[in-house]
Amino acid sequence: MNVAVHLVNPIPAAEQSMVQCGNVKLATYRWGNPNGPTLLLVHGYPDNHEIWLPLINQLATDFQIIAYDVRGAGASDKPQHRRDYRLPLLADDLQAVILAHSPNQPVHLIAHDWGSIQSWEGVTEPRLQKHLASYTSVSGPCLDHVGYWMSRKRPWRQVLGQLLSSWYIAFFHLPFIPQLAWRHGMAKLWPRFLRQVEGIRPVRVSRTQSEDGQHGVKLYRANFIRSLLTPRQRHTQVPVQLVVLTRDRFVKAHLFDDLPRWAPKLWRREVAAGHWQLLAEPSQLAQWVREFVALQEAGENCAALQKAQVHHQNL
């Protein structure tokens, strides 16, 4: 998706480069203040790095910002095999981008949807945690955490509600049909879907929308069943800012109820917004990012963050 917005102070064109990770080349983009803290943005499905442009416009004055097209999206390579989209390889991609652009300073990671899902793999990987100053996760849980969540006794309404919200996951596991849908019209219908379901205007089709949709379904096929049926214990000591969208039609808030078990340094923010709304209208997210980075960089703990912090007695 490409959210077409009128930028009050348009940002300069990004500095583009390619980062090699194994056999895959990743397209990376750099904006902003090279002397500021580094933000690393990871997009979801079926998007590419362009989804972040409204947020980048609000933050580029004070931060160095790096974004990349994940494998299978945008200008990055698009491996053909499902096995090439497994979570450990996606964590390797994250590490490669960090080492290419900020090898000596930890980055503040911000991710949405599938970008958040795959970033959890890196955030919970011991070898990567030293490279991460913080993690802001928007509407994308760790699949292993979800696997443990589902294995515990839950109110049937919660489980049924999440299953109904996740109908698209079953669709993406069907052979051939999802790719054919993206190839033959779904890309052109995508802006209408976002207008009607999310209320987002205006939206235009990205030039790589069809390919992004076709290749991105491999993310689901390579990881969902494996992670949900045989979840791993994935812990992190990285400070996590969890952004819960209470009007999200696809990811329900109760999926994150057990997160303090896995991420003890946790702040939880809630906002009445749909799945893509905070990226299209990013003022609130930009403010939260500024506050969270200021806390980690300078110890500036505002009242809103004090309220959002999840303390052990709340577990």
Label the predicted regions.
Residues 2-14, 24, 47, 51, ...:
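Flexible "cap/lid" subdomain of the alpha/beta-hydrolase fold that forms the substrate-access gate
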Residues 22-30:
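A short loop-to-beta-strand scaffold at the N-terminal edge of the catalytic core in hydrolase folds
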Residues 28, 94-98, 285, 289:
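Generic hydrophobic alpha-helical segments
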Residues 29-77:
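Conserved HGGG/HGGXW glycine-rich cap/lid loop of the alpha/beta-hydrolase fold
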Residues 33-34, 100-105, 296:
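Glycine-rich phosphate-binding loop signature in dinucleotide/nucleotide-binding domains
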Residues 44, 113, 280-281:
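Active-site helix-initiating loop/hinge in glycosyltransferases
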Residues 55, 122, 255, 288-292:
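Hydrophobic residues on the short alpha-helix immediately C-terminal to a glycine-rich phosphate/catalytic loop
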Residues 264-315:
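Catalytic active-site module of serine/aspartate enzymes centered on a nucleophile-bearing elbow/loop
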